[in-house]
Amino acid sequence: MKTLLLTLVVVTIVCLDLGYTRRCFTTPSVRSERCPPGQEVCYTKTWTDGHGGSRGKRVDLGCAATCPTPKKKDIKTICCSKDNCNTFPKWP
């Protein structure tokens, strides 16, 4: 009985990942970083900057508690909830 109880305790400790936080790519450095507690969503925002796209395409990567809602209709936001799932987009 003691062996069974000890085994269950060890398995519980191994299976629980206490203090785990999500990892997402962030800008401007585009490197993987731990998200603050409570922020479990990775996001990628893309848009064209400047008049008629003269300044090029822009990207914002980061962490959030919920998927950010774009303030402008031309901002595309993609959210995911796995570690480092918000990689820098490939441009056509």
UniProtKB/Swiss-Prot annotation:
GO terms for cellular component: extracellular region. It is found in: Secreted. Gene3D superfamilies: CD59 (2.10.60.10). Its main location: secreted. Pfam families: Toxin_cobra-type (PF21947). Keywords: Acetylcholine receptor inhibiting toxin, Disulfide bond, Ion channel impairing toxin, Neurotoxin, Postsynaptic neurotoxin, Secreted, Signal, Toxin. Residues 1-21 form the signal peptide. Disulfide bonds join 24-42, 35-63, 67-79, 80-85. Expressed by the venom gland. CDD domains: TFP_snake_toxin (cd00206). SUPFAM superfamilies: Snake toxin-like. GO terms for molecular function: acetylcholine receptor inhibitor activity; ion channel regulator activity; toxin activity. Belongs to the three-finger toxin family. Long-chain subfamily. Type II alpha-neurotoxin sub-subfamily. Binds with high affinity to muscular (alpha-1/CHRNA1) and neuronal (alpha-7/CHRNA7) nicotinic acetylcholine receptor (nAChR) and inhibits acetylcholine from binding to the receptor, thereby impairing neuromuscular and neuronal transmission. This is Long neurotoxin 3FTx-Oxy2.
